[in-house]
């Protein structure tokens, strides 16, 4: 999907989906210092995602609209970029509750981020993180209301449908 440069800079967007590729990131000393805090095992889903959250919450995340490397995925990549339009991707996500598990993981990451950086966050950011972290415990209507009210939508039709139907 085509990524909107303004959405990539918003904490709301970065809570639900990473759009950052670590090997293309540049960070400054302030961000590096903030990133050196201990985080519980399994609470930080990906280091580049975590760094983007810190930048969006306490500074700025800037989108560069040009390729800086030739990225290709090798057969042995465990994560790597996936194509959400492919049938294989959709089937893999539907099997065994993967969509829900993925969304619950992002909520857990939001709670860990709040715990780690509460003192540096604005009251609105604290409320956003607390609301999103608590989302797995809420009913579907309450979660959808939160997404709509806070703009917590994933990029791409397939991802958004998965977010609506399976969480």
Task: Give residue spans per PLM region.
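Conserved nucleotide-sugar donor-binding catalytic segment
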Residues: 4-82
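C-terminal subregions of glycosyltransferases and related glycan-biosynthesis enzymes
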Residues: 37, 44, 50, 72-167
């Amino acid at each position: 999907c085509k990524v909107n440069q303004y959405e990539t800079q918003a904490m709301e967007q970065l809570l639900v989906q990473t759009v950052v590729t670590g090997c293309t990131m540049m960070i400054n000393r302030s961000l590096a210092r903030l990133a050196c805090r201990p985080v519980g095992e399994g609470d930080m889903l990906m280091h580049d995602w975590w760094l983007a959250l810190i930048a969006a919450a306490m500074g700025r995340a800037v989108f560069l609209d040009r390729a800086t490397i030739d990225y290709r995925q090798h057969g042995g990549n465990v994560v790597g970029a996936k194509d959400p339009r492919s049938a294989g991707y959709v089937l893999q996500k539907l099997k065994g509750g993967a969509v829900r598990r993925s969304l619950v993981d992002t909520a857990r990451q939001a709670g860990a981020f709040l715990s780690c950086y509460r003192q540096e966050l604005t009251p609105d950011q604290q409320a956003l993180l607390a609301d999103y972290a608590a989302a797995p415990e809420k009913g579907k209507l309450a979660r959808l209301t939160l997404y709509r009210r806070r703009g917590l939508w994933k990029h791409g039709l397939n991802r958004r449908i998965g977010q609506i139907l399976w969480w």
